């Protein structure tokens, strides 16, 4: 019947895709060993209806924060391959799964915003989405994640379409009792100018207002 035919085609497609990837990697192990060790996941096979329509409407994620040198596998074909932490290629991969008018959100370490080591991922994100909203949170006295994670966090929200804008917040320091109200307190400030790949400052509304006043005064 049709269901069995579909399953057979899916199995054949998965096998041929695995064979192609195995050859591309020049892996000395057998195909079966490579599949067992790598556990390849083929998005277009697992979600055919999604990719017929161009990708996911919304992609939301919390990628792993792990130094590249500490993982025992390799990844290929990413513009962000040389980033120190694997959250960068995870951000890139997630973006590639999004449809042309889709929306995107990732929670990542604050290094995404300012570190030179992650300039490439900022360039990639800026080239893929038009509107960026980035909120930033300290780890003291409280943090979004448990203390063992030990990171200051940036929540990156983006969408495709519309004029290119970047909005950021100040670095929020907060107590645990504020957690349920934290997002209600967020204030974004639109960056007056920004360059693709450049660090995203976190001036906050008050400092931005002061800058604008100084600029206006000098223009008079």
Question: How does the language model describe each region?
Answer:
Residues 1-40, 45, 52-58:
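Basic, amphipathic N-terminal segments
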Residues 42-220:
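Signature of N6-adenine DNA methyltransferases within the class I
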């Amino acid at each position: 019947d049709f269901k069995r035919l579909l399953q057979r085609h899916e199995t054949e497609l998965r096998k041929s895709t695995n064979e192609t990837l195995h050859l591309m990697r020049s892996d000395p192990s057998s195909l079966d060993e490579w599949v067992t060790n790598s556990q390849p996941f083929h998005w277009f096979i697992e979600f055919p209806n999604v990719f017929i329509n161009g990708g996911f409407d919304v992609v939301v994620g919390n990628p792993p924060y792990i130094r590249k040198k500490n993982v025992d596998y390799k990844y290929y074909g990413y513009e962000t391959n040389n980033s120190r932490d694997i959250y960068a290629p995870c951000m890139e991969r997630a973006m590639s799964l999004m449809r042309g008018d889709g929306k995107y959100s990732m929670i990542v370490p604050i290094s995404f915003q300012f570190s030179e080591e992650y300039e490439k991922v900022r360039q990639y994100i800026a080239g893929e989405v038009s509107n960026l909203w980035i909120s930033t949170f300290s780890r003291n006295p409280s943090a979004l994640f448990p203390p063992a994670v030990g990171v200051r966090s940036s929540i990156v929200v983006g969408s495709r379409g519309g004029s290119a804008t970047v909005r950021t917040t100040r670095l929020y320091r907060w107590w645990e009792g504020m957690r349920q109200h934290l997002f209600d307190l967020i204030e974004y400030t639109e960056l007056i100018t920004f360059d693709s790949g450049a660090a995203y400052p976190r001036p906050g509304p008050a400092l931005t207002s002061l800058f604008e006043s100084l600029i206006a005064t000098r223009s008079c």
